[in-house]
A protein has these predicted regions:
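Short alpha-helices
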Residues: 1-62
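Electropositive phosphate-/nucleotide-binding environments in soluble metabolic enzymes
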Residues: 12, 25, 29, 83, ...
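Residues that form generic nucleotide/phosphate-binding pockets
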Residues: 21, 34, 38, 54-57, ...
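Generic signature of intrinsically disordered, low-complexity segments enriched in small/polar residues
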Residues: 22-25, 57, 66, 74, ...
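Short alpha-helical "patches" and their helix-cap loops
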Residues: 28-37, 66-77, 149-154
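Active-site rim beta-loop-alpha module in soluble metabolic enzymes
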Residues: 45-124
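Gly/His-enriched, cation/cofactor- and phosphate-binding structural elements
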Residues: 94-197
Length: 197
């Protein structure tokens, strides 16, 4: 239909794309710039981690909460509130990462018939999957896997990598998706057990 507009852009977050689409003649607010900065894992703007920690604490999100947020030039008040939350979050992430173990996953690499076993680090983490996954990726040099059991007994997997390692190759094998440095899929408990042998 003529009413559909699709834009795929790996250099902008969905929040930034939506703002620019619906407000083409308006300066992008600092809040949206910070959301974009964190969503793409750039952290080029001071305070993005703190701001995200504050926003994550608002869950479950509602339109009333978003309407109450400041879209002013600075987000200084939100940074300050988020800084305390971020300190506590970082402690939790480090505690979770301390329980990681090696994970061995086979996935395609290069050609269709070229499969490799890759060793990374994995941990059960129902919270802070992105942060935990990135810490594990830094430690392993390949990938980090933050997983948890959902209410149906399926294993929700959040893969992260830093640099050139492509975690989407793993997720796609198991019916998931994502991009080079962040991907996810859902697998059975038996599959997870194979990865953690």
């Amino acid at each position: 239909s003529g009413n559909v507009h699709i834009e795929l852009n790996n250099n902008k977050s969905g929040a930034l794309i939506a703002w620019e689409y619906f407000h083409p003649d308006t300066e992008v607010p600092m809040l949206i710039k910070h959301i974009d900065d964190r969503d793409r894992w750039q952290f080029k703007l001071d305070g993005s981690k703190e701001l995200h920690a504050y926003l994550a604490g608002l869950r479950p999100w509602s339109f009333q909460q978003w309407d109450g947020l400041t879209f002013s030039e600075t987000c200084e008040d939100l940074y300050q509130e988020g800084a305390a939350i971020l300190r506590a979050q970082n402690q939790t992430v480090q505690q979770i990462v301390g329980h990681a173990r090696k994970s061995y996953i086979e996935h395609p690499h290069g050609g269709d018939n070229d499969w490799v076993f890759v060793t990374g680090l994995a941990v059960n983490s129902p919270v802070h999957q992105s942060e935990v996954g990135h810490e594990l990726a830094n430690k392993s040099g390949t990938f980090g896997l933050a997983w948890y059991l959902d209410e149906d007994g399926d294993v929700r997997c959040s893969f992260r990598s830093n640099g050139d390692y492509d975690v989407s190759a793993i997720a796609k094998v198991f019916g998931g998706g994502g991009h080079r440095n962040a991907a996810g899929c859902t697998v059975s408990l038996d599959t997870l057990k194979e990865w953690l042998k």
